[in-house]
Amino acid sequence: MSETILITGSSRGIGKAIALRLAQAGFDIVVHCRSRIEEAEAVAQAVRELGQNARVLQFDVSCRSEAADKLTADVEAHGAYYGVVLNAGLTRDNAFPALTDEDWDRVLRTNLDGFYNVLHPIMMPMIRRRKAGRIVCITSVSGLIGNRGQVNYSASKAGIIGAAKALAVELAKRKITVNCVAPGLIDTDILDENVPIDEILKMIPAGRMGDPEEVAHAVNFLMGEKAAYVTRQVIAVNGGLC
């Protein structure tokens, strides 16, 4: 029987690429979305066409009660997850003086609170498996070096890195690894039109944007058996930006 991995925010973009790559590696996939249910179902079907099982969960990671209810019910019905990829997130970019309370709160609730809201309900079931497990958090270069116009986003992603490193210490003896993958500028259809791509490209030694599949390959490595001794780390996929 294949192990199962939950991937939040996997209806498109990087999350979709991760779902398909992990399915190719032989994992069953729980596709997650907040609102794009048709796109999520399409990803699930693509996973099935790769020979793996897939199902879809729909909930808002920023809503603690909703996340707990949906995840608890899914684990009770299907069993604990082997792995989790925390990919769901959003941006509300603006210069710091121009940020609104909602800009700040929405980003922190989704990106940082989402870490707790998703992992807390499923943590004890993962531990009770008494088997190896994997947690990968998709963070950002912004969480490593900060980025102009992204004080809220940078704070949320840096917070995830800190939380992941602390959780890695707690779970290491239980053979559950916790790591982060920090993408830089990645070419997806959800790239914010306000992102100064030409300006950023000048700062990237590789001279190009990354592909979602390149992020997915890093996640695939961390999910594998050969990464059992890799924990509490941040793998940057950013073309040398930092």
From Swiss-Prot:
Cross-referenced CDD domains: BKR_SDR_c
InterPro entries registered for this protein in UniProt: FabG-rel (IPR011285), NAD(P)-bd_dom_sf (IPR036291), SDR (IPR050259), SDR_fam (IPR002347)
UniProt: substrate binding residues: S140
An example Gene Ontology molecular-function term: 3-oxoacyl-[acyl-carrier-protein] reductase (NADPH) activity
Enzyme Commission number, as recorded: 1.1.1.100
Positions bound to NADP(+): G9, S10, S11, R12, R34, D60, V61, N87, Y153, S154, A155, S156, K157, I186
Keyword Transcription regulation in record: no
Gene Ontology biological process terms from the UniProt entry: fatty acid biosynthetic process
Pathway terms, separated by semicolons: Lipid metabolism; fatty acid biosynthesis
Catalytic residues in the record: Y153 (proton acceptor)
Top-level lineage group: Bacteria
Keywords for this protein: Fatty acid biosynthesis, Fatty acid metabolism, Lipid biosynthesis, Lipid metabolism, NADP, Oxidoreductase
Pfam families associated with the record: adh_short (PF00106)
Recorded catalytic activity of this chain's protein: a (3R)-hydroxyacyl-[ACP] + NADP(+) = a 3-oxoacyl-[ACP] + NADPH + H(+)
NCBIfam families the UniProt entry points to: fabG_rel (TIGR01831), PRK05653.1-5 (NF004200), PRK12826.1-2 (NF009466)
Subunit structure: Homotetramer.
Family label: Belongs to the short-chain dehydrogenases/reductases (SDR) family.
Annotated protein name in UniProt: 3-oxoacyl-[acyl-carrier-protein] reductase FabG
Organism name: Aggregatibacter actinomycetemcomitans (Actinobacillus actinomycetemcomitans)
Organism ancestry: Bacteria, Pseudomonadati, Pseudomonadota, Gammaproteobacteria, Pasteurellales
